[in-house]
Regions:
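Extended, well-folded interaction surfaces typified by the phenylalanyl-tRNA synthetase beta subunit core
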Residues: 94-112
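The canonical Cys-X-X-Cys-His
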Residues: 1-8, 47, 82, 86, ...
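Extended intrinsically disordered, low-complexity coil regions enriched in Ser, Thr, Gly, Ala
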Residues: 10, 19, 41-46, 56-63, ...
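Inter-heme linker and motif-flanking segments adjacent to c-type heme-binding CXXCH motifs
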Residues: 57-60, 88-97, 128-134, 155-160, ...
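Protein kinase-like catalytic domain
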Residues: 5, 52-55, 87-90, 141, ...
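Electrostatic cytochrome c docking/interface patches
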Residues: 113-142, 184
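Electron-transfer interface patches adjacent to heme c in soluble/periplasmic c-type cytochromes
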Residues: 20-49, 69-79, 165-204, 216-229
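Short, conserved phosphate-binding/catalytic loop or strand-edge motifs used
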Residues: 62-68, 106, 213-214
Length: 230
């Protein structure tokens, strides 16, 4: 959460970070428990609806710069843990700038049509033919990890090309988010241990250094359980 919800030089998770999109600049929200400017007045049900359906507490649609299309796959236990952690932070009174997109993207009710095209709310059922480890990995990659948000290309409406180019690579802030899996063009094949080392340390002798938008991802994964990263 910190990577997107912290402005340069700001308090962690107090929001206000500008995120450039093809449709305008979106400002991240205050995730601290301040009741006036943050989520201090949010019930778990409201938090869960935002994470799974992309709808704020007051009923307005959120923009998919907040990757609820991925977070919808998170399990109930993970969402409960996130909610508890966020509300245990120090409350910071910080009103963030209002997001103002150009017409027609500023008409939030149109997000209902976008969601009908690109959003399938709710957790995905485990694949019975796969192991528990594989299913946990799929939940993390496609859900809370939201790897597809950067590593899957998007169409002109900002929707992920998940069916035709899932994890097929994309450009993010001028950086290449390379294809993952079988489509990766690395001259040295990735091994499981190499991937774990890279994701937790940001470096591997055969695969270079994680820079650009990937750097804060590594900073977060360095604190994650190795079992989840693996």
């Amino acid at each position: 959460c910190v990577a997107c919800h912290t402005a340069d030089g700001g308090v962690p998770n107090a929001g206000g970070r500008p995120m450039a999109t093809p449709f305008g600049i979106v400002y991240s929200t205050n995730l601290t428990p301040d009741p006036a400017t943050g989520i201090g007045g949010w019930s778990f049900s409201a938090f869960q609806r935002a994470m799974r359906e992309g709808v704020s507490r007051d009923g307005h649609h959120l923009y998919p710069a907040f990757p609820y299309t991925a977070f919808t796959q998170a399990g109930d236990d993970d969402l409960q843990a996130l909610y508890a952690h966020l509300l245990a932070q120090p409350a910071v009174a910080h009103a963030v700038p209002e997001t103002r997109l150009a017409f027609p993207y500023n008409i939030r009710p149109l997000m209902g049509l976008w969601n009908a095209l690109y959003h399938q709310p709710g957790p995905v059922a485990p694949v019975a033919e796969q192991s528990a480890l594989w299913n946990r990995g799929a939940t993390l990659v496609n859900g809370l990890g939201h790897c597809t948000a950067c590593h899957t290309p998007r169409d002109a409406r900002g929707g992920e090309l998940a069916r035709s180019a899932y994890l097929g690579g994309a450009l993010v802030d001028g950086w290449e988010a390379p294809p993952l899996g079988a489509l990766n063009r690395s001259p040295v094949p990735w091994t499981e241990d190499a991937m774990v080392q890279y994701l937790r340390s940001g470096h591997h002798a055969h695969h270079g250094i994680a820079g650009g938008p990937m750097a804060p991802v590594v900073q977060a994964l360095a604190q994650a359980d190795e079992a989840d990263v693996r």
